[in-house]
Amino acid sequence: MDVLEIDDGLWRWTAFHEEWNEQVGCVYVETEDGVVLIDPLVPNEDTAKFWKALDRDVKKRKGPVHVLITVFWHARSAAEMRERYDARIWGPSAGKAAIARRTGVVTDAFGPDDELPGGIEAHRTARAAEVVYWVPEHSALVPGDVLLADGKGGARMCPESWLPASKTPRDLAASLRPLLDLPVRRVLVSHGRPVLTGGGRALARALEL
């Protein structure tokens, strides 16, 4: 488990994902509406240390815990967060049933333009059941699977094989292009190394075809 403080109130940690057989990234955000966890996964090493730190932070914030899921494949430890903190589980309405099969419940299914905790926004993608979160307070994008690290310090779109049969990389790029209008500084990918500076440029390069 690696833990990185990116900004005041914004952290990213990694945990080993047994199905992927690799480390994946998860995001912790402190907001006025409580603690927000995006695609959280409890590490299978240093587990007690992880829970102790998170318990402390949740207690310090004195507010509810919200779990935001980008895509049903990233339900991960959402059910454990609900059991431990009575967390609200948020997910895109198009993926509600698939998320619920993995978590037991989706307390808050949202659609386009719905208000999310802490002023976080959800942006649609060419994968109907997946969103990209925008955390304006930290100028950070948090994608699930549609954007990945490119291994060179930047980002890239997911492989075409990950898209629905009716969609192409051009469709994915078009769905993500509105994100270029945001003042993106960071792209906190789940798979690979996050982009911590120059996120807007990295995003623009990722969408070039």
Question: How should each PLM-predicted stretch be described?
Answer:
Residues 7-14, 117-121:
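Short, hydrophobic/aromatic-rich segments at coil-to-beta transitions
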Residues 46-47, 75-78, 97, 130, ...:
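Short, well-ordered alpha-helical microsegments
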Residues 75-124:
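Hydrophobic, well-structured mid-protein blocks that either form specific transmembrane helices
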Residues 12, 28-30, 134-136:
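Short, well-ordered beta-strand micro-motif
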Residues 2, 17-22, 34-45, 121-209:
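Metallo-beta-lactamase
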Residues 26, 51, 55, 176-177:
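Short hydrophobic/charged patches on amphipathic alpha-helices used for structural packing
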Residues 1-5, 28, 113:
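Short, exposed beta-strand/loop patches in secreted or surface proteins that constitute
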Residues 44-92:
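Active-site metal-binding motif and surrounding structural segment of the metallo-beta-lactamase
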